From Swiss-Prot:
This is SWI/SNF chromatin-remodeling complex subunit snf30. Its main location: cytoplasm. GO terms for biological process: chromatin remodeling; regulation of transcription by RNA polymerase II; transcription initiation-coupled chromatin remodeling. Component of the SWI/SNF complex, an ATP-dependent chromatin remodeling complex, required for the positive and negative regulation of gene expression of a large number of genes. It changes chromatin structure by altering DNA-histone contacts within a nucleosome, leading eventually to a change in nucleosome position, thus facilitating or repressing binding of gene-specific transcription factors. It comes from Schizosaccharomyces pombe (strain 972 / ATCC 24843) (Fission yeast). It comes from the Eukaryota. The keyword Transcription applies. Residues 123-150, 157-167 have a biased composition (Polar residues). Keywords: Chromatin regulator, Cytoplasm, Nucleus, Transcription, Transcription regulation. It is found in: Cytoplasm; Nucleus. One of its GO terms (cellular component) is nucleus.
Amino acid sequence: MSFVSKSPPIVNSASPTGQVNPMEVEKANKLLEINRLILWKCLELQHIKTAQNSTLEQRALSTELFNSYIQRLKANLAFVVSIASPRQMQVLTPPLSCPESLPQLEPLYKELRQYFQIAQTSTLSYPPSNGDSSSYANGTDLHGNTGTMQQEEKANPSLTRSDSVSSGSYITMQGANSLKAQQDLLNSFTGAPSNNSHNIPDPNLSQTFSATSMGPPNNNYSKFRTDNYLARSSNRSGTPNIQNEQSRFFDSQQAQVQARALMQRYQQGMEFNK
């Protein structure tokens, strides 16, 4: 299943001078925050995959989750890069519904949907989407679940913008380092060389995104454990598809080692330079 919506391409609304619209900065920062937590779950899933005490079913389920997270990360990063690019790349709307297996991310996705809703009502740069956005409006998420999104809309009938714009509107290239860090981590998972990743924003771009900490999730997000989800999922009906056991996303133990090394370097305040 693709996590990129099938809506018409969107042209982002940065000015000719390269300055990014404050609302676009809000979207980018929120997506980077979401990605940080998803990347940590990918590390957990790799541990489950390589652990000697993991059952075949647990490995199959972890592979399934991992692949879906990777697709979501790619879509999110493509959108963030398109906002920062002075060339105004055309990309599709990123996923706007929270993954079923990561319910603790719903508050972040709720804010993200608000940013897109505000943009749709205030500018023509974002036409209605036939993909994830419309799924949210129809009360159906990426996993086919219904009702949750509709309940949220009823509880929040008016989506209004905050009076103040976050500090992400006035930032330095430290934000680009955060974006590059996530791209490097994604490449370490997929085995792709660094020069095949999305282009990092032009160093001359005067405004980019606020840095996102790559440290472990805080207590608000650490209550959920991926292995608990796998244990619950193992009770579902049907036999898991284990044909993805040799998936390229689990190429080798080396990928896990590289990912953890990158994470450690970031926590120590080192820059991610090629």
